[in-house]
């Protein structure tokens, strides 16, 4: 390329450092073990209170499927939510979504609309709404968010909770726990390891399913595999209009320099997928949930490719105004859990369906 990338916000040094330390039981992890013990005691006490106190977890009048991670950082939760929503609709359900909305600037409970700024509701809830068309409500209190969702859309007959695995106040019927190739890392709790809670934490759900966003199971827990691949690429303006990505468009970027920009938890995974597709990419890794307050690539950059999670923070008019010479492409991820996973989900939800007779 003709110019080096500008001084964009890079991944937080502490975040990147700990992510590496969490893969092994080295000196840093051992030094953090006392803090992990305190954290573990607090987690165990919280879970015990919910387990022993009837009514502490609130039922909202609809089946609830919670999708989340046992580990810190991205493991494939958002594409799992989108895949589950598509499957539920094919099965005749009318799903809605509740989410905390990580990184949002607004407070309280709020419905997500296609034109809601990502910083108001969070990048992942906005992406889920745009990709699935499902109604989404964000709020730190998932019970309040679910109540608002059902008031606005009473026809909803199943609620999918995005990243609510540790939010015990919302009672759930099914838990989907997502792991990637890191598995449980070094097997220790935060901050000595990546675990938010032990991987074998008793579930408050009737059914717990484990899904591996990896080539093979990465923990001892039995689970299901998923196939993941880039579906292609699409111009940013066309992406906002709902145009699907095309493999031919992605292939057309081969043989020329492309800046790959990613503000996600595991940016290297995105870069590797682009290289696997035959692209010659220059990497620009930003912090997870990067706000894109300033566009991080120089005006001389001819082609930039981003994830969908970042695309929701890039309005077309702004990009054209601030980087008129740059073509921005979006590379969506196709995330396809194996059929046995969906069969298990259907089995768990069948007794809870409002359409069930007798």
Curated annotation (Swiss-Prot):
Q: Name one GO molecular function term.
A: ATP binding
Positions of disulphide bridges: none
Show the catalytic activity. a lipid A disaccharide + ATP = a lipid IVA + ADP + H(+)
Q: Name one GO biological process term.
A: lipid A biosynthetic process
Task: Name the enzyme group at the top EC level.
Answer: transferase
Q: Name one Pfam family in it.
A: LpxK
Q: Which residues bind ATP?
A: 71-78
Give the keywords, sorted.
Answer: ATP-binding, Kinase, Lipid A biosynthesis, Lipid biosynthesis, Lipid metabolism, Nucleotide-binding, Transferase
UniProt EC number: 2.7.1.130
- One Gene Ontology cellular component: plasma membrane
What residues form the membrane-spanning segments?
A: none
- Identify the metabolic or biological route this protein is part of: Glycolipid biosynthesis; lipid IV(A) biosynthesis; lipid IV(A) from (3R)-3-hydroxytetradecanoyl-[acyl-carrier-protein] and UDP-N-acetyl-alpha-D-glucosamine: step 6/6
Q: Which InterPro entries match?
A: LpxK, P-loop_NTPase
Q: Does the keyword Transmembrane apply?
A: no
The job of this chain, per UniProt, is described as:
Transfers the gamma-phosphate of ATP to the 4'-position of a tetraacyldisaccharide 1-phosphate intermediate (termed DS-1-P) to form tetraacyldisaccharide 1,4'-bis-phosphate (lipid IVA).
| Name this protein carries in UniProt | Tetraacyldisaccharide 4'-kinase
Q: Name the gene that codes for it.
A: lpxK
